């Protein structure tokens, strides 16, 4: 089974790190290799341009792929988006020079030139907004085009807005919100690799569910149990186990990482002791 992943760019490292958290580790010893073996038997990583991944998966050259949602939309590829990931978040925006004294798209009256690598997204957006524009298709950095005089405005990806600001631009409208996504060929369910793909998807979902969660173990005296349980948030309910030769219980629960200090303070005040907090690798439902 082949999975297409980015060979460079802002998604490459997060994708490799995510797959490692899932348990899929590639052998990247040869920087020139385009097909990378992994520790999963029969699973290979195909290193390609992020924007090419949707068409590669659509063609069946790879059963799975991880790319940006924006590239799936731009390519019009007929693929299944199976999982939206929690990284690679960005927006496709219409950005104009800060010197333009406008705050809304509707204030653009004259025909303008717009530089973008998102030709299809731009075309649909401009038609929808009834903006008269000539699209200047590029493959490199769009934000420099207005200062070069090659365009009046741009449609491009924005993460924080810092790069736009550095080039004297401001976002005027958000066209599309994007993040990394796991995509599959439409026929993946019928393929010989369906079982392997299903297992991989299960592990991916498990790794995502475990993000920013911690497991807490604590010992609670019998007479304090109800009070401690009442103070606990939980995915369902805490797990209880009677301690041998003791009038106490072991209580186990899963908590969002941000809530850890608050939870520890509450359960300790209510009588819990021997509190242990551990990382969670995966949560498989």
UniProtKB/Swiss-Prot annotation:
Keywords: Amino-acid biosynthesis, ATP-binding, Cytoplasm, Glycosyltransferase, Histidine biosynthesis, Magnesium, Metal-binding, Nucleotide-binding, Transferase. It is an enzyme of class 2 (transferase). It holds the Pfam family HisG. It catalyses: 1-(5-phospho-beta-D-ribosyl)-ATP + diphosphate = 5-phospho-alpha-D-ribose 1-diphosphate + ATP. Feedback inhibited by histidine. It comes from the Archaea. It is found in: Cytoplasm. Its cofactor is Mg(2+). Signal peptide: none annotated. GO terms for molecular function: ATP binding; ATP phosphoribosyltransferase activity; magnesium ion binding. One of its GO terms (cellular component) is cytoplasm. Catalyzes the condensation of ATP and 5-phosphoribose 1-diphosphate to form N'-(5'-phosphoribosyl)-ATP (PR-ATP). Has a crucial role in the pathway because the rate of histidine biosynthesis seems to be controlled primarily by regulation of HisG enzymatic activity. Belongs to the ATP phosphoribosyltransferase family. Long subfamily. This is ATP phosphoribosyltransferase. It comes from Sulfurisphaera tokodaii (strain DSM 16993 / JCM 10545 / NBRC 100140 / 7). The gene is hisG.
């Amino acid at each position: 089974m082949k999975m297409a992943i980015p060979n460079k760019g802002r998604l490459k490292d997060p994708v490799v790190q995510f797959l490692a958290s899932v348990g899929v580790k590639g052998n990247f010893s040869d920087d020139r290799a385009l097909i990378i073996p992994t520790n999963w038997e029969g699973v290979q990583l195909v290193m390609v341009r992020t924007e090419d991944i949707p068409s590669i998966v659509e063609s069946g050259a790879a059963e799975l792929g991880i790319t940006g949602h924006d590239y799936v939309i731009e390519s019009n590829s007929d693929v299944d988006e199976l999982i939206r990931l929690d990284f690679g978040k960005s927006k496709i925006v219409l950005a104009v020079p800060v010197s333009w004294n406008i705050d809304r798209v509707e204030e653009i009256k004259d025909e303008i030139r717009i530089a973008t690598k998102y030709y299809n997204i731009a075309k649909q957006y401009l038609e929808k907004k009834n903006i008269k524009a000539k699209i200047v298709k590029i493959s490199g950095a769009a934000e420099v085009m207005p200062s070069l005089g090659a365009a009046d405005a741009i449609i491009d990806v924005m993460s924080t807005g810092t790069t736009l600001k550095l080039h004297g631009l401001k976002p005027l409208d958000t066209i599309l919100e994007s993040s990394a996504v796991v995509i599959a060929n439409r026929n993946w369910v019928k393929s010989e690799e369906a079982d392997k793909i299903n297992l991989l998807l299960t592990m991916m979902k498990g790794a995502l569910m475990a993000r920013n969660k911690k497991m807490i173990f604590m010992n609670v005296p019998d007479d304090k149990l109800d009070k401690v349980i009442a103070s606990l948030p939980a995915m369902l309910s805490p797990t209880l186990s009677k301690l041998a030769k003791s009038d106490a219980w072991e209580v186990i629960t899963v908590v969002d990482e941000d809530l850890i200090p608050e939870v520890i303070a509450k359960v300790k005040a209510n009588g819990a002791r021997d509190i242990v907090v551990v990382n969670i690798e995966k949560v498989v439902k």
